[in-house]
Amino acid sequence: MKDISDKRVNISLDNPSITFDKNKCDECSICKNICKFNVGVYGFSKDDYPCINCGSCTLACPNKCLSEKDETDKLEEYLHSNKVIVMQTAPAVRVSLGEEFGMKLGTNVEGKMITALRTIGADYVFDTTFGADLTVMEEASELVNRIKTSKKLPMFTSCCPSWVKFCEMFYPEYLDNLSTCKSPISMMGSVINNYFCKINNLKREDIISIVIVPCTSKKMEILRYNDIDLAITTRELAKYLKKEKINLAKLKNSSYNSLLGKGSSGGIIFGTSGGVMEATLREVYHILYKRYPKGRLLNFKSIRGTSNVKEAVVKINGTHIKVAIINGTGDARKVIEKIKNKEVYYDFIEVMTCEGGCISGGGQPRVFPLNKNLKNKRMNALYKSDKRMKIRCASMNPDIKDIYDNFFGEVGSDISLKYLHTKHRNEE
């Protein structure tokens, strides 16, 4: 029998990302309002269980009756297998995980996190920012080609799986406007399986591929491509570390494995709203000018922050590119309706389901209230890392140059299209 209520979000039993405990629910409707007004899903679908897996409801629920699908038992099972454990960590996790261990908001625990993952059994720990650099290389080229041919504009980013599912559910006529690029974690998953395994004389079945993410919808995303075995949220990782009596705050720092390389600082800011846009525009500048940007594109303040919709016009080598950054799929709905009515025009649009981007993802530590001060501290920690690094553009990264020279050949090659791109589907 279906358990449907008009006072809360309704979560199906087979939801791959989110679970619901009815016994804890007092039907306060906070989750419903978040899903309706911020996420733009509740009340817009005829489905009994409409969900884009973002997990915003899990952060808003004061009773914790909504939560991520806990897969720490599966994590433990994998860690005790006889297979090679390969992990990757998304950018936003490093500036939020410390909160679960009493550290100050926005503390960057990258080195301690890597040590913790090796302590619990990871054989290799890679940085998802390398996958973000791959995304930038492919997406910047895709954008330049679309602008030159005036086809399939505006181009929307495709890094956020909840936004992609939102588009598939409600605006299938715009699926061709989505970038065909996979997200950074999915690009990394594909590269681990098809490049890392090859150069290490491993078969896909010899490894367990695990990603640590700020986002519940990554649990849904990995089911689409089968390149990754398990997606563990920041909250789940903290829970498992505490179970193993590992105090993150007391660990020493260590570094990512270098075989797949570390990403540029542009990959780091993928974890915050506007970061995908900023990193991509840096590479667009490089493509059109044949040199690397300085000034504004390395500190693009007008597209940073947590405002619902941000706009800018960028002039690069005579080409004017009008861009928008959207915080929340609820606002994406409003902007798309304006585009349909020809009230506004853009060339490139970044959409993140969660306000502030991945730093506010549905798998992040629960902090009440989840206010702008918290988001800004996490966000600023990522921008601080961006500012202090020397390699700030994807194509400046020597490891990116190596993988294109040794495996992909060139941006947009047949091999790139096979492993780094995808086709979006109609969910109607």
Protein language model features and the residues they cover:
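Iron-sulfur cluster-binding cysteine motifs and their immediate structural context
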Residues: K2-L13, S17-F20, K24-D73
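Iron-sulfur-associated redox domains of electron-transfer enzymes in respiratory
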Residues: E68-E428
